[in-house]
């Protein structure tokens, strides 16, 4: 690794450390109704919207009403995006004349963006119009992220309130989430535009090629069509809301989505900003910042080794080139390492770092092709996702999924010392433990059963670009990604009706079943009294607590997915080590 690579990684950490507290404090003040510098603008608008909708800011909901409101809102979003894709040929802002999207692909896309997954089985430049991108997909980038944040705040109320039966008002919290996302997205979009990302309603432009070329039919090609569009506004919230769906097919590897090293830095910071700041906000809301920081430290302990392994796997290069005498060492002429599927403006270190960050969160954006990573690099990406998107995770969803693991860890710890388990002053009883267990098992079942079905039928195996262990990895990655609402992919997997429908089902269940169970947990905890810690209570901010949570997460992750990983990336790695080249 060069000095520039180290400086890039350190700069990410420094910027996040500087922004963590002010961003967390801002979110805390927004959700608790305290005054912020944006209150003069947003408070009157919020009051007007709530009045127009017949909702009051002081009207609270129990967890069931909250869940119903969430599902109604989300299903309306799915239906709207589905219909929009089917009628886009009749609507304006369609310079390339995009036609109606096939119904199964349209359903997959609608569910994908509403669930914050942003799995893309289509080419955005040619499949959807500017209007569909703007009022359909970009709007859902805001709304799906806001829903995740809303569920988290309701879950936090479960711990911070006592002897109650309400967990907030869905509509009020939804609006306040938008007040957080909107100004931050605006700033990020301006930065992207300043660096060269397009934000225009003009159609594509035709430019002459520097060197003429021939197409597959032997015809001489002298010009190229370059797609444009209102990209910067969608890219900003795609990153900030950990959505990940690209305006262009190459996603953040495209020079219009991610033009420079500086935009790469901005996009990485945008991905991590809200997830890490939510830990601080969580601590503030339950009355102890150090408890939120303890959760953040646990996430960091899991993250740093994964980041290191991901980078190490790529800077070493591809052993298949060694017998050919091809140098993969870094020099003033090349970045070195495994450069297949990577942009030269980023190199292997920035590409690997981006891939780890986008898979530990639920973002799913890519600045390189994950399918071209070394087996260990691919293993890290898949394992990141399979951990449950809890290492930072998606905005809102990452922290509430992490807290479910904390519940299980504290339950086990309580049983080991022979006392009633408790967390943040709330007792953990069989009902909460059953819900937490189901919460963790649902994505595990979706991933493993979905993969098993796909590898057992022709409709599943015929869509992989590679046979053997890498083909299995492509399928395993796909079902891991959609079930955990990540959205990235090993791009060697193509779409058909089977994958469009099965992945849509996994996305829907993986998002909303988990969210509903989280709300049920919030409803159970909010009704409990807060009990003072006693002798033998595991302090929920001490190093022992952090280590125990990390240990619990790793045990559950290893036991759940090690057999499946052994059939894919682990086998690839062993073949690579044994022969120096991968044969598939």
UniProtKB/Swiss-Prot annotation:
Cited Pfam families: KdpA (PF03814)
InterPro entries with a match to the protein in the record: KdpA
Localization per record: Cell membrane
Cellular-component GO terms for this entry: plasma membrane
TM region(s), chain numbering: 8-28, 65-85, 139-159, 172-192, 262-282, 292-312, 398-418, 440-460, 507-527, 544-564
Membrane topology qualifier: Multi-pass membrane protein
Annotated NCBIfam families: kdpA
Protein name from the UniProt record: Potassium-transporting ATPase potassium-binding subunit
Organism for this UniProt entry: Methanoregula boonei (strain DSM 21154 / JCM 14090 / 6A8)
């Amino acid at each position: 690794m060069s000095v520039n690579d180290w400086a890039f990684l350190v700069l990410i950490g420094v910027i996040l450390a500087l922004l963590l507290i002010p961003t967390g404090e801002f979110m805390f003040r927004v959700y608790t109704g305290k005054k912020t510098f944006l209150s003069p603008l947003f408070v009157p608008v919020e009051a007007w919207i709530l009045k127009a909708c017949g909702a009051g800011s002081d009207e609270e909901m129990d967890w069931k009403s909250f869940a119903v409101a969430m599902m109604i809102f989300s299903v309306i979003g799915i239906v709207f995006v589905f219909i929009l894709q089917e009628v886009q040929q009749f609507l304006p802002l369609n310079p390339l004349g995009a036609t109606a999207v096939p119904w199964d692909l349209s359903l997959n896309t609608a569910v994908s963006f509403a669930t914050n997954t942003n799995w893309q089985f289509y080419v955005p430049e040619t499949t959807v119009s500017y209007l569909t991108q703007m009022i359909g997909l970009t709007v859902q980038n805001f709304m799906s992220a806001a829903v995740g944040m809303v569920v988290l705040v309701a879950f936090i109320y479960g711990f911070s309130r006592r002897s109650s039966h309400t967990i907030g008002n869905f509509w009020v919290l939804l609006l306040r989430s938008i007040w957080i996302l909107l100004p931050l997205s605006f700033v990020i979009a301006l930065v992207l535009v300043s660096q060269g990302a397009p934000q225009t309603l003009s159609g594509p432009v035709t430019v002459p090629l520097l060197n003429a070329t021939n197409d597959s039919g032997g015809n001489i090609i002298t010009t190229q069509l370059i797609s444009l569009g209102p990209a910067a506004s969608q890219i900003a919230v795609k990153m900030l809301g950990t959505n990940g769906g690209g305006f262009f097919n190459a996603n953040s590897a495209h020079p219009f989505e991610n033009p420079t090293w500086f935009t790469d830095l901005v996009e990485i910071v945008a991905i991590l900003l809200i997830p890490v700041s939510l830990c601080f906000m969580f601590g503030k809301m339950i009355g102890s910042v150090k408890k939120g920081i303890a959760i953040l430290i646990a996430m960091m302990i899991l993250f740093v080794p994964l980041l290191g392994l991901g980078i190490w796997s790529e800077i070493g290069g591809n052993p298949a080139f060694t017998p050919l005498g091809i140098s993969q060492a870094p020099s003033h002429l090349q970045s070195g390492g495994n450069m297949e599927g990577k942009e030269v403006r980023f190199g292997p270190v920035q590409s690997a770092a981006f891939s780890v960050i986008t898979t530990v969160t639920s973002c799913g954006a890519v600045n390189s092709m994950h399918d071209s990573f070394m087996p260990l690099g691919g293993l890290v990406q898949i394992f990141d996702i399979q951990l449950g998107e809890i290492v930072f995770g998606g905005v809102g969803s990452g922290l509430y999924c992490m807290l479910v693991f904390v519940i299980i860890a504290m339950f086990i710890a309580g049983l080991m010392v022979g006392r009633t388990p408790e967390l943040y002053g709330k007792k953990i009883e069989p009902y909460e433990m059953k819900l937490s267990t189901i919460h963790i098992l649902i994505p595990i079942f979706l991933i493993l059963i979905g993969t098993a079905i796909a590898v057992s039928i022709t409709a599943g195996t015929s869509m992989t670009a590679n046979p053997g262990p890498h083909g299995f990895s492509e399928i395993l990655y796909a079902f891991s990604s959609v079930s955990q609402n990540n959205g990235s992919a090993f791009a060697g997997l193509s779409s058909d009706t089977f994958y469009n429908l099965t992945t849509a089902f996994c996305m829907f269940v993986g998002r909303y079943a988990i969210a509903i169970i989280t709300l049920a947990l919030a409803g159970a905890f909010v009704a409990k009294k807060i009990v003072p810690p006693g002798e033998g209570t595991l302090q929920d901010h001490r190093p022992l607590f952090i280590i125990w949570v990390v240990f619990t997460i790793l045990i559950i992750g290893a036991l759940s997915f090690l057999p499946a990983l052994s059939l894919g990336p682990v086998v690839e790695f062993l073949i690579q080590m044994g022969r120096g080249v991968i044969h598939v």
